[in-house]
Each structure stands twice: as C-alpha cells, then as structure tokens.
Design a protein with these regions (language model features):
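Conserved NTPase motor "head" modules and their coupling/switch loops across ABC/AAA+ ATPases, GTPases
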Residues: 60-200
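Long, non-coiled-coil amphipathic alpha-helical linker/lever segments
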Residues: 26, 33-84
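Nucleotide-state sensing region of NTPase/ATPase domains
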Residues: 1-21, 25-37, 92-96, 125, ...
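Alpha-helix initiation/capping motif
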Residues: 14-15, 40, 122, 146
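Long, contiguous hydrophobic alpha-helical segments, chiefly transmembrane helices and signal peptides
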Residues: 2-7, 14-15, 25-30, 44, ...
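Generic secondary-structure boundary/loop-capping signal
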Residues: 4, 11-12, 34, 52, ...
Length: 201
C-alpha cells in the first residue's frame, strides 16, 4: 500500500491559519503512518453526528441509545487523543536531532483531554469525556453541535529556549519551523521501512 502526503501552499502559513488547519495537518501526518487512524477519525465523526441528530429530536425513550453513542464517542475520542500524543512524542524526539540546524522546538496539544491523558490513565480520561458529554447535552441541543470534543484541540509549537509560541514569530521564522516539523516527519518515516509514502507539493 502506498500512501500520499500533500504539502499545499497554505501549509507554509500553518501558524497564521486557524486551529482546524493545524489539527488537519497533524491528522494528515498520522493517517499517513497509521492506517487505523483515519478510520477512527471517521467513526468518531459518524457517532458525533448521530448523537446530535438524536439530541435534536430528544425524548426520554432515547436515553439508552444516546448513552451508547456517547460511550462509543468517548472511546474513539481517547484512542484519537492517544494516537496524537504518541505521534507528537516521536516528532519531538526527532526535532531534537535538528536543534543545531533549526530552532529547538516542542510540539504540544492544547485540548483538555490531551492534557489530561498526559497524567491520567486512558480509562479515567474516557470517563471524564463521558461526563462532559452528558453535562453538555442541553447546550449541544441548543447550539446544534458537540461543544466538548477531541476536535477542539490545537497543535502548538514552542521555542524551547524562550517558550515563545510559534504564532508569535515572523512569517519567515514560522516557515523554518514548519520545514523542521516536516523534516522530523520524514525522519520518522525513514525509521519505519514498512511505510511507502509519496510526497506531493
């Protein structure tokens, strides 16, 4: 199987774009190396949409069905968070090897679930997610969307020495940071001989 990875013009403006673009960039990299990740994202989106549809026509007879969907949503959500966490861990290790060429960088995720997963077992994070989904039902009905979700996170990059957010750097400096992330990703691919990926720009 040969996967493809596209580097589009707006990639060079990643840290000037919105969080959805940065999250999509991260998810695209992970999907290139983990065939299950894209399926998990798809399943997560499917259950998220299904939950909103049911909540919009809510009645007490649907409570058990909503609980079942929320359980699925929380389960896939934690799997996605964990995959992102593990991938960033590898990227950060590779970024350290480029510190003599590029700025010393640390990549992080801003999401509440992402941060919780760094210090708590996955089962506890899943339970926390379930509680948030239950607490937010009325709010989600009113707004017609899932207000607490793994798709609310943002990819952050910091200069390790100054702890300056990449979004504060100049356009030229941001492009250097983006290239260093891509080189780190390529290094990750080189360490896995089972992966066949074609890059397009």
């Amino acid at each position: 199987i040969i996967n493809t990875f596209w580097i589009v013009p707006k990639t060079t403006f990643l840290f000037q774009n919105n969080s959805e673009d940065r999250r999509g960039f991260l998810d695209h990299m992970i999907s290139s190396v983990d065939s299950d990740y894209k399926k998990n994202l798809s399943n997560y989106d499917k259950f998220k949409s299904e939950r909103i549809k049911i909540l919009k026509r809510w009645n007490n007879n649907q409570l058990e069905w909503v609980k079942l969907i929320e359980k699925k949503l929380a389960s896939y959500g934690v799997i996605i968070c964990d995959a992102r966490r593990n991938f960033l861990k590898e990227l950060n290790q590779n970024l350290n090897t480029f510190s003599s060429i590029f700025p010393s960088l640390q990549l992080e995720l801003s999401g509440e679930l992402d941060k919780l997963l760094l210090k708590s077992p996955a089962v506890e994070v899943e339970d926390f997610f379930l509680r948030k989904l239950e607490e937010n039902r009325n709010k989600d009905i009113l707004m017609g969307k899932t207000n607490f979700s793994v798709n609310k996170t943002d990819l952050l990059a910091f200069d390790i020495d100054s702890m300056t957010d990449a979004r504060s750097f100049s356009t030229g400096e941001q492009k250097i940071i983006i290239f260093s992330i891509i080189f780190s990703f390529i290094k990750l691919l080189e360490s896995n001989s089972n992966l066949n990926i074609i890059f397009f720009s």
